[in-house]
Structure formats: structure tokens, C-alpha cells
Amino acid sequence: MALKEYKPTSPARRHMTVADFAEITKAKPEKRLTKPVRKSGGRNAHGKVTTRHIGGGHKRRYRVIDWRRDKDGVPAKVAAIEYDPNRTARIALLHYLDGEKRYILAPVGVAVGDTLVSGADVDIRPGNALPVRTIPLGTVIHNVETAPGSGAKMIRTAGSFGQLMAKEGGYAQIRLPSGEVRKVLQDCKATIGQLGNVESSSVRVGKAGKSRWLGIRPTVRGLAMNPVDHPHGGGEGKSGQGNPHPVSPWGQKTKGLKTRNNRRTDKFIVTRRRPGVRNTQR
């Protein structure tokens, strides 16, 4: 993937960059592998906003991705590389030898015509899926399960990769893109290689309208609101927030507080993540 730049014909065009989509080989998705997506506008079943800054956006169909890679020993040929509006990574359409078709996330180095396979004793090459116990130490991986057979949960965004660091006592230690080192059972599956569309994080949106196409609404500062709308609102001119600590629109303290509540899985974290560190370039 490469980034396309424009001549500065307008203030938005001056700094806008887009993907060139050179790797895309098929425009329309496989209809049987798609589902409708119903927009929520960030609202729950009662109609209340539970997630701010969501609304609008282009109509999409969800592409059903094979997260489990459970067709062990059945070779599949890469039929196409496609765009997926629901994620940053590209997806690959696989045609299995038995006639079944499935989507997977497309790693770097996988092209149309390649043959991929999953199983315990397959080759270590990009796109193949194996149990972690059969993967050599130091191998670059993505699409990692957190429990055997649960489907991939970690390392799924464009350009990301993890690295197998150690194996001990039925568990394997994997360094995640955030710098966190996490333990998973050695029977969990992972896919070899780094995910494609590596320069996705370098794309510059350029204008507000493009964010609206993506379904992202504006983020308004609490300081710019009225007192009825936010605890930071009101005052004459550019006055301060008026609180000893910044708070959310609902009065909860924000900024600098821990947001992780899932203590149940703390025992699987060997090394905490390092803020500002991300493995997306090799």
C-alpha cells in the first residue's frame, strides 16, 4: 500500500492523503459472506446515547470473517484481496478445495493465487494458522486467540503484529503491539505474519466531511458548552473549567485515571503496556 497525495486545490486537499488501493483486486464483496449492519447512532435500546460522537456515515454491509481458522488440513487458494469498510485491514477471499469460501484478514506478502492452510503441522509462512505450541520463538504473528477455539481476539488492526517471546508450563508469552507481554495457552491459534495496509495509521483525513462519511460526529469541548450541558461549561469569555480536576459530562473524574476494571485476566499479563509505544512498522 502507498499513500496518494493531492495538489492543494483547496485547504482540505492541501494536506489530505488517501490509500491508493493498489492491492485491491475485487470491488464487490461475496454476497453470501455479508450481513446487514443496523446503525445505532451510539444509542442503546432505550434510545439514550451511550457512546458519544457516533452517527451518520456511509451505508455498510458486514463482512463475515473466519476468526477461528478451523478447517485444518484443507488447502485454500487466495481468490481476491478486498476492501472492508468495517476495519482498517484488508481482507482476503479464500476458496477452499472442498468448495467453501471464507474471508480472512490479509497479511503482508499474501497475494492472489497463493495457497494457505491451517493446522498443527503446516509451514511457517504468512497467512497460515497454527497452534502457538508449534510456532518457533521469535516468529511474527497476528490474529491471536485468548482461549482455544474462541476465535482471534488480539492483534487484528492494520499493520500490527505480535511476537512469540517464550513458552513455559503450557502457556506462551506474546508481545503485543502496545508493548504488553501477555500469556495465552499454547493450544490457542495464531496466524503467521504482519497484517497488511501498514500505512493505514499515516492517512490524513484532511477535512471534517470525511470523518462524517466514516460515521464520526464532532467532539465538542466541555468548556465551550453551557452550564446545563457540561460541568466545565459557562462563564464569561474563555474562563477555566472551575473544577480542581477535569470531569466528564456526567461529573466523573477523567484524565489520568485507570480505565481497566477486568482484574480476572490480570494474571495473564506478564509486562504492562508502554504508553506511546506501538509495533506497526517492521
Curated annotation (Swiss-Prot):
Keyword Ribonucleoprotein attributed: yes
Entry superkingdom: Bacteria
Basic residues biased stretches: 34-55, 270-282
Keyword Plastid listed: no
Keywords, alphabetical: Ribonucleoprotein, Ribosomal protein, RNA-binding, rRNA-binding
Any one GO CC term of the record: large ribosomal subunit
Alphabetical list of SUPFAM superfamilies matching this protein: Nucleic acid-binding proteins (SSF50249), Translation proteins SH3-like domain (SSF50104)
InterPro entries xref list: NA-bd_OB-fold, Rib_uL2_dom2, Ribosomal_uL2, Ribosomal_uL2_bac/org-type, Ribosomal_uL2_C, Ribosomal_uL2_dom3, Ribosomal_uL2_RNA-bd_dom, Translation_prot_SH3-like_sf
One BP term from GO: cytoplasmic translation
Segments for region (Disordered): 31-55, 223-282
Molecular function as annotated in GO: rRNA binding; structural constituent of ribosome; transferase activity
Coiled-coil intervals: none
PANTHER family: LARGE RIBOSOMAL SUBUNIT PROTEIN UL2M (PTHR13691:SF5), RIBOSOMAL PROTEIN L2 (PTHR13691)
Subunit structure, interactors included: Part of the 50S ribosomal subunit. Forms a bridge to the 30S subunit in the 70S ribosome.
Family: Belongs to the universal ribosomal protein uL2 family.
Function: One of the primary rRNA binding proteins. Required for association of the 30S and 50S subunits to form the 70S ribosome, for tRNA binding and peptide bond formation. It has been suggested to have peptidyltransferase activity; this is somewhat controversial. Makes several contacts with the 16S rRNA in the 70S ribosome.
Name of this protein: Large ribosomal subunit protein uL2
Organism: Anaeromyxobacter dehalogenans (strain 2CP-C)
